[in-house]
UniProtKB/Swiss-Prot annotation:
Entry-linked Gene3D superfamilies: Arfaptin homology (AH) domain/BAR domain (1.20.1270.60)
UniProt-recorded name of the protein: Regulator of cytoskeleton and endocytosis RVS161
Gene: RVS161
Keywords: Cytoplasm, Cytoskeleton, Endocytosis, Virulence
Superkingdom assignment: Eukaryota
Function in brief: Component of a cytoskeletal structure that is required for the formation of endocytic vesicles at the plasma membrane level. Plays an important role in virulence.
Expression induction: Expression is induced in absence of HOG1 under non-stressed conditions.
Classification of source organism: Eukaryota, Fungi, Dikarya, Ascomycota, Saccharomycotina
Length: 264
């Protein structure tokens, strides 16, 4: 910050001491548009974070699936010697989730960034620029109010130097012009930005739905194929509500093993 900017900041900080209610400038139309903008900014920022989180979570899910598949594969590898019904299911399951990760998830990464993340990010980048413009308006508003207060005091209590009032009035006129120009620009352009939000986000929303659909349908399609390698009897028991009882019987058998009580 320059020395001149520093002095202005100090003067603005003390403005509330010398600026009275009569000097303050109110613009309800701007206040309404600013509130609408802040609502848009909050939604846009949250959408950007959530969109990135969605892609990160997809990666996390598929990575976990691959890890689980590798563990299950190793478990069923041990059962091959006993000619288990599930001798090959671990292999098919691992192959399926790895193909899903490589052929689907990694392939949607680029399109998702291009059609969802990047456009949402570009829109959100404007928020910092608009925030700076609103901040600048607030500073110019304080400058304008200070000039109004200065003229008011000189009118109420004339100075010995007769030239002070004309100088103050000139400063007031310049401050008002600067403030009005920026204030009017924001009042005109903030509604335009807000109106653009739907047509801007629409293509990204459509792309998001299509990518989600592909992720879900291809994931379901691949995993559904694994069912043919599962024991048909177990599927029927699950459908008829009998599988829980079978699992309870197995747990009872495990508890009956002497090895489970060795640590007691």
């Amino acid at each position: 910050m320059s020395w001149g900017g520093f002095k202005k900041a100090i003067n603005r900080a003390g403005a509330s001491v010398i600026v009275k209610d009569v000097d303050k400038t109110m613009d309800k139309d701007f206040d309404v548009e600013e509130r609408r903008y802040k609502t848009l900014k909050t939604a846009g920022t949250n959408l950007q974070k959530a969109a990135k989180g969605y892609l990160d979570n997809i990666r996390a899910i598929t990575n976990s699936q691959v890890t689980i598949a590798e563990i299950i594969y190793n478990l069923y590898e041990e059962s091959k010697q006993g000619q288990s019904l599930y001798s090959n299911v671990g292999t098919y399951y691992m192959q399926s989730v790895k193909e899903f990760d490589e052929e689907t998830v990694k392939q949607i990464d680029g399109p998702y960034r291009e059609t969802v993340l990047d456009p949402i990010g570009k829109f959100s980048n404007y928020f910092s620029e608009i925030d700076e413009a609103i901040k600048k308006r607030a500073h110019k508003k304080i400058d304008y109010e200070q000039c109004k207060a200065k003229v008011r005091r000189l009118v109420d209590k004339p100075a010995k130097d007769a030239a002070k009032l004309p100088r103050a009035e000139k400063e007031l006129s310049m401050a008002k012009e600067i403030y009005d120009e920026l204030n009017d620009q924001l009042k005109a352009e903030l509604p335009q930005l807000i109106a653009l939000r739907v047509p801007f986000y629409d293509p990204s929303f459509e792309a998001l739905v299509k990518i989600q659909l592909r992720f879900c349908t291809e994931g379901y399609s691949r995993l559904a194929q694994i069912q043919q390698y599962l024991d048909p009897a177990s599927r029927d028991e699950y459908a008829n509500g009998l599988l829980d009882g079978k699992i309870d019987d197995m747990l009872a058998q495990m508890q009956g093993l002497s090895i489970t009580s060795l640590g007691k």
